[in-house]
Every structure is written in structure tokens, then in C-alpha cells.
A protein has these predicted regions:
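A structural signal for multi-pass alpha-helical bundles of membrane permease subunits
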Residues: 2-283
Length: 283
């Protein structure tokens, strides 16, 4: 059996590997090369060195988008994981209808980001108009919290499922031992459940942080970066630089921003994984 698997292994792997190289590796390498070029199309790319990176890093809109994205990532990560964990704790108690509640909370995750963006744009603008407040296109504060609400509504159910699975995998023996030792519910949560859930926290934090930094379609549909790029996140800023600005130089600058963005997300994600996985070892 093992000989047969080894014999036919390349046959099954090569198509997937070829598709991965053609669809990801080669475009990624080409994208890095183009970030050092001035171009309109790939065929007329002209090497100009690090000029695109200098212009990208000195672009005020890129810096403002970075600050906005970091603030959004921090707030959304804390809210999503805090609320999802609280709901998971409630749904792992002995109560009727828990499966129905899990399904209802998870359903928003199945809706596309563009659709959600337009739905929430209508809802939030209706609320703002009733309160005699400026609409999203003229209200950066409402735009920020609108994206936060949208992201939480979409992601909480997914993270809740991960936390529920983690809570259900806590060994009953540990809970019984804690009860025998006289630990109350809060002590059991802090001393027993949380250490056993570090792997779940690692996954959920990784997903929420990366999703927050990569957010594009919801941002495009809900605010489009208005007013005056005040609610423009990094992904949308890169898109607007590449497609919405006139001039051949902006293509290369947009590509340089994309490479910087990729490095930023990788560094932050790996740092978070290292920090939380070290807690798993201690646990």
C-alpha cells in the first residue's frame, strides 16, 4: 500500500503544485519586480529602482490609512474575540436551543462582504438621518464605528464556533477537580478553562487580526473611504492608488504599497502567533 502511495503521489501533487506556482508564486514574484518599475502594462515596465517605495512611504494618504487600519484592527479584534468568547461560554451551558443560537450567530459569516456593506450602509444612514447627524459620506466617526459594527456582526459567529469547540474539549476531570478544590466559576474560568483554550485564542486572534488588516470589500461598500479618505483602510488605499489615480507612476507606487502591506501583515501575524503559542507551551 505504501509503495503504491509513493508511486502515484507525484501524479496527484503535480497538478496542484503547478496551479499554485502559476496562480500564486509567479504573480507574486512578478508583483515584487513591478514594484521597482514604472509601467502601464506588464509589457512596458521600466526599472526605476526604489523610487516607488520612497513615494509610497511619503504618501500622506498611505500613512493615514495605516493609522486608521491599526486603530480598526485593535478595536475590532478586542470586541470580536471578547463578545464571541462570552457567547461561547453562554452556549456551552446546559440550556435549550443552543444549536439554534449557534446557527443564527454563524449565519452572517455566510453573507458576502459587498452585500453586507451596502446593507449596513442603508441601516446606518437611516439611523444617522433620524438622529439629525451627517451621513456616512460626511461623517468619519460614524464611518469608523460603522465598519467596526459590520465586522463584528460578520465575524463573531465564526469565532464563537471555534471557542465553543475549545470549551467542549476541556477535560471534565479538570473541571471536577477544580470543583472539589472549592473553585468558583470565575476561578475555574481563569485557572482551568483559559489556559486550555490558548490554542483557540491563537487561531481566533490570527484570523481577526489578518482579516482586519486585509479588509477591503466591506470598506469599499460601506464608506468608500469617505469623507476625503478619512475612513480609507490600507487595502482600499492600494486599490485607489493603482486604479483611481491618473499617470503611469501610480501603478508602480500602488504595487510598492502592496508589497509593503504584505510584509506588514506577515510580520504582525507571525508576531501574534509567536506570542500566543508561547502561552500554549506554558499552559
Amino acid at each position: 500500500m505504501e509503495k503504491a502511495l509513493k508511486k502515484w503521489f507525484p501524479v496527484f501533487v503535480l497538478p496542484t503544485l503547478a496551479a499554485f506556482c502559476v496562480g500564486f508564486i509567479w504573480p507574486f514574484i512578478q508583483g515584487i519586480y513591478l514594484s521597482f518599475c514604472q509601467f502601464i502594462t506588464v509589457d512596458n515596465a521600466k526599472w526605476i529602482g526604489v523610487t516607488n517605495y520612497v513615494r509610497a512611504l511619503t504618501d500622506e494618504t498611505f500613512g493615514d490609512s495605516f493609522v486608521f487600519t491599526v486603530a480598526f484592527a485593535i478595536v475590532s479584534t478586542l470586541l470580536i474575540n471578547g463578545i464571541a468568547f462570552a457567547i461561547a461560554l453562554a452556549l456551552t451551558k446546559e440550556m435549550k436551543g443552543t444549536n439554534i443560537f449557534r446557527t443564527v450567530f454563524f449565519m452572517p459569516n455566510l453573507i458576502g462582504g459587498i452585500v453586507l456593506g451596502y446593507i449596513w450602509q442603508i441601516l446606518i444612514n437611516c439611523v444617522l438621518s433620524n438622529l439629525a447627524q451627517p451621513l456616512l459620506a460626511l461623517n468619519s466617526t460614524a464611518g469608523f464605528w460603522g465598519i467596526i459594527i459590520l465586522m463584528c456582526w460578520q465575524q463573531i459567529g465564526y469565532m464563537m464556533i471555534i471557542y465553543v469547540a475549545g470549551l467542549q474539549n476541556v477535560p471534565p476531570d479538570l473541571l471536577e477537580a477544580a470543583a472539589i478544590d472549592g473553585a468558583n466559576a470565575i476561578q475555574t474560568l481563569i485557572k482551568v478553562k483559559l489556559p486550555m483554550l490558548m490554542s483557540s485564542f491563537t487561531i481566533c486572534l490570527f484570523l481577526t487580526i489578518t482579516n482586519s488588516f486585509k479588509l477591503f470589500d466591506q470598506n469599499l461598500a460601506l464608506t468608500s473611504g469617505e469623507p476625503a479618505h478619512a475612513t480609507e483602510m490600507l487595502a482600499l488605499n492600494i486599490y485607489n492608488t493603482f486604479y483611481s489615480r491618473a499617470g503611469a507612476q501610480w501603478k508602480g507606487i500602488g504595487q510598492a504599497k502592496a508589497v509593503i502591506f504584505f510584509i506588514l501583515v506577515v510580520v504582525i501575524s507571525l508576531s501574534q502567533l509567536y506570542a500566543t503559542r508561547s502561552k500554549e507551551v506554558q499552559a
